[in-house]
Curated annotation (Swiss-Prot):
Keywords: Cytoplasm, Elongation factor, GTP-binding, Nucleotide-binding, Protein biosynthesis. This is Elongation factor 2. It comes from the Archaea. GO terms for cellular component: cytosol; ribonucleoprotein complex. It comes from Picrophilus torridus (strain ATCC 700027 / DSM 9790 / JCM 10055 / NBRC 100828 / KAW 2/3). Residues 19-260 form the tr-type G domain. The modification Diphthamide is found at H598. GO terms for molecular function: GTP binding; GTPase activity; translation elongation factor activity. The keyword Secreted does not apply. The gene is fusA. SUPFAM superfamilies: EF-G C-terminal domain-like, P-loop containing nucleoside triphosphate hydrolases, Ribosomal protein S5 domain 2-like, Translation proteins.
Length: 732
């Protein structure tokens, strides 16, 4: 029996002992070395050959990932590691660092209890590091730190042992600043990473060595000796003396929580049901004997096996043949249960609470689905990712015969990657696919062509805009087609704090609130008046609808239809049919026909919508465009060509930081200006540039450009170039 098979046999025994399980992920900025670290950990734990690790990129098993040299999906692997004579099972998820694939990071964080934050010792803490730390702490996932590429400090930057330690102190301080900023108050001190406590390790994932203060004491190695090994080209010897997998996995087992410990404080964060119910208690204690509760964090589409749902089991036992309920999709039967080891799935007969598992047979499950043995389990909190899709492509099948297949493929893809939004138009045959950036869409289109074998034609990338208003407008009269009902809506910008609270998930969307009083209190705290908060009717996207009327007859019966009008108006604004952002919509008055037959959907919905549109015209309509913050590291002598390129794309340079010979330029650029940026910047600098970006919210389109941009969007959508004004809505 080979070492890999032997370890799989050990893993089968450990899945039944929650105290011996660690569910972790590795999260970092792009190219800081996450996948190399994962592969060398898996090899060291005997799950793949050691010569190949780091070159093989086991977890980057998608053809696209290996070609681009970046991780696109979050891949999983389980491995066995021994500490102090006891064996432990570590379920590891490798997550992408590229901003376009941030949705995968969010979903991976839901499945794990601990995270290894990887920071490149030369680059230090970068923007995406901050994003992943924030995401981990929001999900109450405990961090430890691995400082990678330490050999570069010695061989490239020529630092001595003392300067190297100073660099570590700066990185540790920066990471702890993020932990203080984003950790839940009860953990902000307790979870600080600390060299003496053994929650920091450093080394070179590529060269397969690592050390921490506890390890330096065990292996009797000093900083000076590390310096000597690396500077004299003896990293192979160092790797034999201080193997990466031993040091890092020891740190994980000693400092990160097992599922039983973690679920006590994580469940109240991710599940808002009754903690005293049978299933609530079972999840808090990670109990095998309770009902099944599982959250799907990823759907993998396999050409042979079909859809595989990967997720975290919080309570109960799932067996082959178990009948389970998938939230929003009904009852289904488990066909195959397996553990994931990189691309290999190892079939098993049953799995107990606290594990990460892959299941075939969960019909209708998508990333985010709740799976339970109870038909009425309260679903888990939705996974909020920090950014909306910002770039869209129109896509159609090259051959008409492929049209039905393309529609199926698009539905499948949006299931597997919920950060892709798909808009299917059966009538025109042109479908829209929206993602987090140009690269995200490129990879998705590649998969449609190569994995699903559908030939497609795509448009140039289009930017996803938003609409809002400048000031207060209305109350504006909207009349029903039969003229028997009139509504008077007023609109104005929603306070910024309320928008942030909705985006952060502190204020939930919807119109049926479980605890409406708490939502009202949060709205008031974020900036609405007491009366406005009491008038809450509905929250949709980043928009809020309020009822400010008093004692109007029949209004209650009509409110559902008015919510429909509000949602329709927010989905397609009056300027360019784009979604509306950050709007406060207040119903100030209404006149209704006493006979309900005269105030049905066909009367009320258009009247409400036209009233909101008219009020928005009076309030001064504004088009917003998505922005990105761009970080570009470039040698000093070619800095000019980079700033030129940015200015041509309406970019504004916000900061420049010198780091040795390199300069890091930080700029804010509209997403519209970022299209085609990758190839342009490569040719402008002869490829001597490292850059990445993160989404940075929305900003107004410059006044002098708005009219042209609106006309282009409207023409693309088959509308007349000029938007209607308030006189038009008053005349309806």
């Amino acid at each position: 029996m080979g070492r890999k098979e032997d370890n799989i046999a050990k893993a089968m025994k450990l899945i039944e002992i929650p105290e011996r399980i660690r569910n972790i992920d590795i999260a970092a900025h792009i190219d800081h070395g996450k996948t190399t670290l994962s592969d060398n950990l898996i090899a060291g734990a005997g799950m793949m050959s050691e010569d190949l690790a780091g070159k093989q990129l086991l977890l980057d098993y998608d053809e696209q990932e290996q070609a681009r040299g970046i991780t696109i999906n979050a891949a999983n692997a389980s491995m066995v590691h021994e500490v102090d004579g006891k064996e432990y099972l570590i379920n590891l998820i490798d997550t992408p660092g590229h901003v376009d694939f941030g949705g995968d990071v969010t979903r991976a964080m839901r499945a794990v209890d601990g995270t290894i934050i990887v920071v490149d010792s030369v680059e230090g803490v970068m923007p995406q590091t901050e994003t992943v730390v924030r995401q981990a702490l929001k999900e109450k996932v405990k961090p430890v730190l691995f400082i990678n590429k330490v050999d570069r400090l010695i061989n490239e930057l020529k630092l001595n042992a003392e300067e190297m330690q100073k660099r570590f102190v700066k990185i540790i301080t920066d990471v702890n600043r993020l932990i203080t900023k984003y950790a839940p108050p009860e953990f902000s001190k307790q979870w600080q990473v600390n060299v003496q406590a053994g929650t920091v390790a450093f080394g070179s994932a590529y060269n397969n060595w690592a050390l921490s203060v506890p390890a330096m004491n065990i292996f009797k190695i000093s900083f000076k000796e590390i310096y000597d090994y690396v500077s004299t080209g003896r990293q192979k010897e160092l790797a034999k003396k201080a193997p990466l997998h031993k040091v890092v996995l020891d740190m994980v087992i000693k400092n990160l929580p097992n599922p039983r410990e973690a679920q006590k404080y994580r469940i109240p964060q991710i599940w808002k049901g009754d903690l005293d119910s049978e299933i609530g208690k079972a999840m808090l204690s990670c109990d095998d004997n309770g009902p099944v509760s599982m959250m799907v964090t990823k759907i993998i589409i396999d050409p042979h096996a079909g859809e595989i749902a990967v997720g975290r089991l919080f309570s109960g036992i799932i067996r082959k043949g178990s009948e389970l309920y998938v939230s929003g999709a009904g009852k289904t039967k488990v066909q195959v249960l397996s553990m994931m080891v990189g691309p290999d799935r190892i079939p098993i007969d049953e799995i107990a609470a606290g594990n990460i598992v892959a299941i075939i047979g969960l019909k209708g499950a998508i990333a985010g689905s709740t799976v339970s043995s109870l038909s009425d389990m309260e679903p888990f909190e939705p996974m909020t990712h920090y950014t909306d899709p910002v770039v869209t492509l129109a896509i159609e099948a090259k051959h008409t015969a492929d049209l039905p297949k393309l529609i199926d493929v698009l539905r499948t893809i949006s299931k597997a990657d919920p950060s892709i939004q798909v808009d299917i138009n059966q009538e025109t045959g042109e479908h829209l696919i929206s993602g987090m950036g140009e690269l995200h869409l490129e990879v998705t289109i590649y998969r449609i062509k190569n994995d699903y074998k559908v030939d497609v034609v795509t448009s140039e990338p289009l930017v996803v805009y938003r609409e809002t208003v400048d000031k207060k407008g209305g109350p504006f009269e909207g009349k029903s087609p039969n003229k028997h009902n009139r509504f008077y809506f007023q609109v104005e910008p929603l306070p910024e704090n309320v928008v942030s609270a909705i985006l952060d998930g502190k204020i939930p969307e919807g119109s049926k609130f479980k605890d409406k009083k708490a939502v009202m209190a949060n709205l008031e705290e974020a900036g609405l008046t007491h009366d406005e908060a009491r008038g809450l009717v509905c929250i949709y996207g980043t928009n809020v609808m309020l009822d400010m009327t008093k004692g109007i007859q029949y209004l209650d019966e009509t409110m559902e239809l008015l919510i429909e009008s509000f949602n329709e108006a927010m989905d397609k604004g009056p300027l360019a049919n784009e979604k509306v952002y950050g709007l406060k919509v207040s119903l100030m008055d209404a006149k209704l026909h006493e006979d309900s037959i005269h105030r049905g959907p066909a009367q009320v919905i258009p009247a409400g919508r036209n009233s909101i549109y008219g009020a928005m015209c009076e309030a001064g309509r504004v088009l917003l465009e998505p922005m990105q913050k761009v970080f570009i590291s470039v040698p000093q002598e070619i800095m000019g060509s980079v700033t030129n390129e940015l200015q041509q794309r309406r970019g504004v340079v916000e900061d420049m930081q010198q780091n040795g010979e390199e300069i890091t330029i930080i700029a804010k650029v509209p997403v519209a200006g970022m299209i085609g940026f990758a190839s342009a910047i490569r040719s402008a600098t002869g490829g001597k540039v490292i850059w990445n970006s993160e989404n940075a919210g929305y900003q107004r389109v410059p006044y002098e450009m708005q009219k042209d941009v609106v006309a282009k969007i409207r023409e693309r959508k088959g509308l007349k170039p000029e938007p209607y004004n308030e006189e038009y809505y008053a005349s309806l």
